[in-house]
Amino acid sequence: MDSQELKTLINYYCQERYFHHVLLVASEGIKRYGSDPVFRFYHAYGTLMEGKTQEALREFEAIKNKQDVSLCSLLALIYAHKMSPNPDREAILESDARVKEQRKGAGEKALYHAGLFLWHIGRHDKAREYIDRMIKISDGSKQGHVLKAWLDITRGKEPYTKKALKYFEEGLQDGNDTFALLGKAQCLEMRQNYSGALETVNQIIVNFPSFLPAFVKKMKLQLALQDWDQTVETAQRLLLQDSQNVEALRMQALYYVCREGDIEKASTKLENLGNTLDAMEPQNAQLFYNITLAFSRTCGRSQLILQKIQTLLERAFSLNPQQSEFATELGYQMILQGRVKEALKWYKTAMTLDETSVSALVGFIQCQLIEGQLQDADQQLEFLNEIQQSIGKSAELIYLHAVLAMKKNKRQEEVINLLNDVLDTHFSQLEGLPLGIQYFEKLNPDFLLEIVMEYLSFCPMQPASPGQPLCPLLRRCISVLETVVRTVPGLLQTVFLIAKVKYLSGDIEAAFNNLQHCLEHNPSYADAHLLLAQVYLSQEKVKLCSQSLELCLSYDFKVRDYPLYHLIKAQSQKKMGEIADAIKTLHMAMSLPGMKRIGASTKSKDRKTEVDTSHRLSIFLELIDVHRLNGEQHEATKVLQDAIHEFSGTSEEVRVTIANADLALAQGDIERALSILQNVTAEQPYFIEAREKMADIYLKHRKDKMLYITCFREIAERMANPRSFLLLGDAYMNILEPEEAIVAYEQALNQNPKDGTLASKMGKALIKTHNYSMAITYYEAALKTGQKNYLCYDLAELLLKLKWYDKAEKVLQHALAHEPVNELSALMEDGRCQVLLAKVYSKMEKLGDAITALQQARELQARVLKRVQMEQPDAVPAQKHLAAEICAEIAKHSVAQRDYEKAIKFYREALVHCETDNKIMLELARLYLAQDDPDSCLRQCALLLQSDQDNEAATMMMADLMFRKQDYEQAVFHLQQLLERKPDNYMTLSRLIDLLRRCGKLEDVPRFFSMAEKRNSRAKLEPGFQYCKGLYLWYTGEPNDALRHFNKARKDRDWGQNALYNMIEICLNPDNETVGGEVFENLDGDLGNSTEKQESVQLAVRTAEKLLKELKPQTVQGHVQLRIMENYCLMATKQKSNVEQALNTFTEIAASEKEHIPALLGMATAYMILKQTPRARNQLKRIAKMNWNAIDAEEFEKSWLLLADIYIQSAKYDMAEDLLKRCLRHNRSCCKAYEYMGYIMEKEQAYTDAALNYEMAWKYSNRTNPAVGYKLAFNYLKAKRYVDSIDICHQVLEAHPTYPKIRKDILDKARASLRP
């Protein structure tokens, strides 16, 4: 590290208050840069902050005359004297006078270091004075501006961060300044731009890999982005570089507590952390204290963890026994450990140290409440109430009021209102905080679980029936618990409570899943086994229920004292038909101390008694039922009478009435059952349940739909609320009367128009019945009554499906026509609407409007993502996915507009949101490939294949890239891998055939056809197979056979268009000649000008024209390609007027389409046919300067060959050879390139070399082109290879017996040369 890096490190440790670290780095600085007094100054400061005041004073005195640090040394002397137990007033006055004197003439560096020191000791305003003066005298020092920016952001005020960011950016203009980069990252983090901050930190790591605070910052930012895996990985990297890194060890311990719930590992890490603190910050009491806070609040009261952090707290208190907050925290620790008397002792100590400590007094009152000292606690709370205005609203204080109200048996509504207030106050302090250590401390899961437990004591103990609206208290509980479990998933108690709430809500599957999670992590969790038994029972899984009860008992014998345990056991025995055992079990439950009867006259308002009442009644009711099932009607009636007497006047009384009706029904007395239920009035708690029971009797026993509906109508009339109308609507749906159901749903909506879920449910129900017009009418009517955007979205989505684009556009514009919103849900809804609007515009072909809508959606989504991580963490993945979708759509539109740079930018942004989205990664890779950026494409494909090894498109792209790098083996390997997994993947096979052609290995193709046939016996009937066969035959010089196979694929939807294009090309150029070329024209002149040949060409052109009419392009580029082919047909006629017409079209396309290779080649070919060679050459030279791409590969090859032809005609053989070698680099099977090379060698009379090239041309034309055979035989003759010459002559004559001249010119001469 250089001097500047060491100073930045010191500044970082000063701000983090790691003073022993300051000492160590300063010592290193003195060792390396002894002449720099700044290191000596910070050595003295570190010494001072470790409590060695006299030693520090001596060190400051020794450097106070050093120019650069004189001012800060004097300020430090004043600070040190004031920290001393007996301050030297005279020395302070003397130093103060010298400060005032020196400040007047202080230089730039002196002012800077003074400002820096004042910032470190927390005197921001004074520091700003010094820095402003320093900036003024230095004419805008960047170093000064960077420090000023640090001052701005450590004040933590939003208006300052914008200005600070500008200063940091200015400070970075001359290079990478670690201090400025660290500040920029901090600034971006404060603005909740965690990704931007992370990028900045990565910049530090790249440029300064040994600067460990950057890794610490990276680790914390990754946690803020809620990426625990990356956080832990960075912590591990840190520990590899510094095994005693406090922050990394703390993060690892926190990970095991919060994320994994692995208490053993967390305990080990905490022990390591304690040892590290002893070694690295032995005097840092505040650090020992700070480290404990997050653990005590997230460990679920684990005694093992609490003991470890108690040791750290005691160490903090021993280092600074005057610190009241340390004693207060020790008191809190004792409460968590259940040691109330010791907690009281510590709280008293804290209040002795600081009489004004509110937190100590709050803890003290909590102890009084636990001990039942209600009067004393009440008095103390009254006192705190009086001073609450000055101390601000405190969730803990409101909670104590709620606990006191419960202890005093206050009304339920009063207690619940207090608990609601506790939650609102508690969560308000979390706003804007990123996920991190401070968030864990402030969230305080332990406190939240206490509140949830209090809520649950007011909730019904019986699970809700299906379709029953959720109890508001349960909804509140689930909201709190989900917040906790998202942040601290390792806290099993939270998961258990979620399971309990889900069970009570009637969501049995969710309850089961959460309990399974609990028991996987802690098999001995007795309460979880007990709740799981209830879950199994509700699912009719009786044997599993019994097993859970046995496990529960084996882990905790105390459950035998729970009435609930016996109740579940009896219910399971009843389900198994063990009625006598169930009766015994219930009688055992009745004898438990908790079941002692209390008459109506001795009712208690104590809520715990009420909770027990629910379980007690359940045992009575179960006993009634089992006696009935056992044929003991008299016993059942007797228990029922006992229950009526026992629970008369309680909230459970109506349950007894319903049980009485059930008993009558079981005895077959339907009339008595209905009569009993009829007596339940609307004023009684279980009125709805009673009427539902009546309705059930009418429908199942009387088969009377009219009376069934009458019950629900009565509920709606007597209790005209949304829930009642919802039940009525569901009842109508149950008897298949949807029109009446809709009326009921509308009444529910009229009373609760803001219930978007209800409104959406109704609309979607209409859609499911295919009643689209009614659904639209409903949505429109609902919107007129003031419904919000969620219904607009549903309506617009329906209109889009129905292709009513204009109406969809109007609906969405209406939804978005409002004042700017800040509510997170409203921002989310606006974002969704903008995305849907963009889809509508795309369908309407209003591309500009579509892009505008997407840009607005992107801006909205950026705002959502900044807030959603803290406000709705469970929504983060969906919102990131939407952000990625928006960026990807913008990128697609950019590609359509040929703005590739913009497209790349947005695809990359999409991947920031969804790093592993395969579709986006693939599109970006394709774009890189099209932009001729193979390295980026390769990286993207490699990343994609890491997550999806079988991705076909990525594998094919990798093959293309390997080919470009001339790594042919790898290219073929990638495609072979795909084909070995799926031999009948014809898309891959077609690409492999092309690649093997370019590799010069077409002889390897047939085995892949065999593989496909083995995989699929009907392969030969597949259009894809026929297409691939045609391709292979075309490439191996069998155009007629190729046409036959392409013809079999030409009607197929997937393969037809490509087959047609290939057939047209074969028709126009069956022998693969260089169209427009002149080199071989004269050699084959007598063949080319024959009448038979001309007639054949005309027939082929007519066939091509017919085939063109079958082409049905679906894209803009497809239509351009069709025009190109049409004009190649015109050129094929060789008629001047047709060629000129084609030339005009090609020119037009080339003018409108940037660098359109096929059009440019078309122009050059037309010029050649028109004998305007210079103009042709100019176009071909343009193409020769362009970068090769796979899409235009064939056109590139043809243009290079044509240009080589021109050069050969002009005897510019070197230039021609370069182009021909380029052809062969990209296509080793290019027989025309070999033929031209052979021709050049022949002209240069290098017959041996000519023969070698003609050999390759003969090989890759599959020995089917007699002209090539003739030339090869001729050059063998010239090279005196007579036998080889004779062999080739025989091969040519065998296939073409009348081929002219070869017998006379070559065969006879070769034979003559062999004769002695």
Swiss-Prot record:
Disulfide bond sites: none
Result when mutating M844V:
Found in a patient with Meckel-Gruber syndrome; uncertain significance; functionally null mutation in vitro
Any idea where this protein resides?
Answer: Cytoplasm, Cytoskeleton, Cilium axoneme
Q: What is the effect of changing L795P?
A: In SRTD4; functionally null mutation in vitro
| Gene Ontology biological-process entries | Bergmann glial cell differentiation; cerebellar Purkinje cell differentiation; cilium assembly; forebrain dorsal/ventral pattern formation; intraciliary retrograde transport; negative regulation of eating behavior; positive regulation of canonical Wnt signaling pathway; positive regulation of gene expression
Q: What happens after mutating R939Q?
A: Hypomorphic variant in vitro
Pfam families named in the record? ARM_TT21 (PF25058), ARM_TT21_2nd (PF25060), ARM_TT21_4th (PF25068), ARM_TT21_5th (PF25064), ARM_TT21_C (PF25063), ARM_TT21_N (PF25062), TPR_8 (PF13181)
- Renumbered ranges of TPR repeats: 108-141, 145-178, 180-211, 285-323, 324-357, 492-525, 563-596, 617-650, 722-755, 757-789, 791-822, 831-864, 884-917, 919-951, 952-985, 1023-1056, 1197-1230, 1232-1264, 1266-1299
Query: Which keywords are on file for this protein?
Result: Cell projection, Ciliopathy, Cilium, Cytoplasm, Cytoskeleton, Disease variant, Intellectual disability, Joubert syndrome, Meckel syndrome, Nephronophthisis, Obesity, Repeat, TPR repeat
- What is the documented function of this protein? Component of the IFT complex A (IFT-A), a complex required for retrograde ciliary transport and entry into cilia of G protein-coupled receptors (GPCRs). Essential for retrograde trafficking of IFT-1, IFT-B and GPCRs. Negatively modulates the SHH signal transduction.
Could you give the subunit structure recorded for this chain? Component of the IFT complex A (IFT-A) complex. IFT-A complex is divided into a core subcomplex composed of IFT122:IFT140:WDR19 which is associated with TULP3 and a peripheral subcomplex composed of IFT43:WDR35:TTC21B. Interacts directy with WDR35 and TTC21B. Interacts with TTC25.
Q: Which family does it belong to?
A: Belongs to the TTC21 family.
Its recorded name reads Tetratricopeptide repeat protein 21B
Q: Show the taxonomic lineage.
A: Eukaryota, Metazoa, Chordata, Craniata, Vertebrata
What is the gene called?
TTC21B
